[in-house]
């Protein structure tokens, strides 16, 4: 084989390997996206079972204003449900109490100090 022919074969092989690598990376990203979507759907279904419609609505409004708080409350509620500590659906008043508890537990305290000269 001549040098130009070897170089052409090498380039072709490199291009093929790069294409395969890109395809596998795209496939991994797509699988991860599907996995996250499935997990989120399962979370929503579980929350639908343990919250009344009014409580779900309130949690949705909280999610708009304070996403981290809503996420923490959802995790707490799902944990309670998975351990069997919930005997009935959570209504809006119970959710308010839970929101306050979680908010108080996760709230950061800020101090403002003035330096006077």
Curated annotation (Swiss-Prot):
Annotated keywords: DNA-binding
Extract the PANTHER family matched here. Answer: PROGRAMMED CELL DEATH PROTEIN 5
Q: Does the keyword RNA-binding apply?
A: no
Q: What is this protein called?
A: DNA-binding protein MK1619
Q: Which GO terms describe its cellular component?
A: cytosol
Does the keyword field hold RNA-binding? no
> InterPro entries, per this entry?
DNA_bind_arc, PDCD5-like, PDCD5-like_sf
Origin organism is Methanopyrus kandleri (strain AV19 / DSM 6324 / JCM 9639 / NBRC 100938)
Q: Which family does it belong to?
A: Belongs to the PDCD5 family.
Q: Which GO terms describe its molecular function?
A: DNA binding
């Amino acid at each position: 084989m001549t040098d130009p022919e070897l170089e052409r074969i090498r380039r072709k092989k490199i291009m093929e390997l790069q294409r395969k690598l890109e395809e596998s990376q795209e496939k991994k990203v797509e699988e991860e996206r599907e996995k996250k979507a499935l997990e989120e759907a399962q979370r929503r279904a579980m929350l639908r079972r343990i919250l009344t419609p009014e409580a779900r609505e309130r949690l949705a409004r909280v999610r708009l204003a304070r996403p981290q708080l809503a996420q923490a409350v959802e995790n707490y509620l799902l944990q309670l449900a998975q351990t069997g500590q919930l005997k009935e659906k959570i209504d809006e008043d119970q959710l308010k109490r839970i929101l306050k508890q979680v908010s108080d537990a996760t709230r950061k305290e800020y101090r403002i100090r003035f330096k006077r000269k």
